[in-house]
Amino acid sequence: MEVEIVWLVKAAWITVWIVSILPLVIASIPSSKLNSFRELVLSFAGRGKILHPSSQKFTVPQKFFGHFYVVGVVWTTLLLAATWMYACKMAGGSHVFSFHMTHVEHRFKVGRAVFLLLLMEIHVLRRVIESFYVFKYSTSARMHILAYVGALFYYVAAPLSLCSNIAPEVARFVGSQVAEFIASGKSHSHDFNLLLSISPLMKLGSLQWIGGAIFLWGWIHQRRCHAILGSLREYPSQAKEYIIPYGDWFEMVSCPHFLAEIVLYLGLLISSGGTDISIWLLFGFVAANLTYAAGETHRWYLQKFENYPASRHAIFPHVY
């Protein structure tokens, strides 16, 4: 079962790369022969202001973005709670661990998964709050229904990718706890022990904390940039207006919130140790998808505003 889940996650990401990222790469090739293909890709991948008015068929309101993060919060919370309880059970001395590694190695592996899921939880919690209380989406802003479904899949697959190597044993642990509860009619929970609860995070290495710091750096700047974007439509009368944003990383690039997203996922990759191909595929998907979206957004800004700052790049300062 363990091998099946691990390979299922890997296969899912490879499929996502073939279906979504490969077309974006082809559409980015500067050739007039690809104009029709480029328009087709943008009709699926575009959203909001970069979605062409002629591509409104089979779309949903962009305010449905909040649905992604609700799914992300619920799913990540479940994974985090189950994995953390399993890690605490191991720390308490009652555990079943893989015979392929020592108990110390396995505890580190489980603790690292707890840390990664905790970072993801911090991320999706902020995003769901921003979706409902910070952003004021234009009533005309739309996204393709396939992009909507794909994003729902993403927020199930991404958290699972962070713990796929231990997900089967966590599932067995949860199953055994449920079976015990059903059989005995009561849970075998113990008094709360703070030291035991934080013990999964006490054995992390320097790589995890470095990655966590990079994640936090991206997280803070994304929060600031989203606050700036939200302030541009502070009043209902501004719902359909587009204004040039200024401040924080907006002084360098057109899509600093995308750059910050890539930075925080880089932090997750570093915290994971970089040994799991699923997390590499996750990071690559985020970077490729947002780089393409940033390029289209940057071109839209240049066409929309004659006084747009010439020094700004699309997403990577002084590069692109």
Swiss-Prot record:
InterPro entries noted in UniProt: 3-oxo-5_a-steroid_4-DH_C, Dfg10/SRD5A3
Cell location: Cell membrane
UniProt keyword list: Cell membrane, Membrane, NADP, Oxidoreductase, Transmembrane, Transmembrane helix
Record's catalysed reaction(s): a di-trans,poly-cis-dolichal + NADP(+) = a di-trans,poly-cis-polyprenal + NADPH + H(+)
A GO term from the CC aspect: plasma membrane
Topology in the lipid bilayer: Multi-pass membrane protein
EC number per UniProt: 1.3.1.94
Cross-referenced PROSITE patterns: S5A_REDUCTASE
Spans traversing the lipid bilayer: 5-25, 64-84, 143-163, 200-220, 243-263, 266-286
Tissue: Expressed in roots and flowers.
Annotated pathway: Protein modification; protein glycosylation
UniProt-recorded Gene Ontology molecular function terms: 3-oxo-5-alpha-steroid 4-dehydrogenase activity; polyprenal reductase activity; steroid dehydrogenase activity
Enzyme class: oxidoreductase
Keyword Aminoacyl-tRNA synthetase in record: no
Main location: membrane
GO process terms (BP): dolichol biosynthetic process; dolichol-linked oligosaccharide biosynthetic process; polyprenol metabolic process
Pfam families in the record: Steroid_dh
Keyword Zinc-finger: no
Function, as annotated: Plays a key role in early steps of protein N-linked glycosylation by being involved in the conversion of polyprenol into dolichol. Acts as a polyprenal reductase that mediates the reduction of polyprenal into dolichal in a NADP-dependent mechanism. Dolichols are required for the synthesis of dolichol-linked monosaccharides and the oligosaccharide precursor used for N-glycosylation. Involved in the regulation of plant growth and reproductive processes.
Similarity comment: Belongs to the steroid 5-alpha reductase family. Polyprenal reductase subfamily.
Protein name: Polyprenal reductase 1
Source organism of the structure: Arabidopsis thaliana
Gene, per the UniProt record: PPRD1
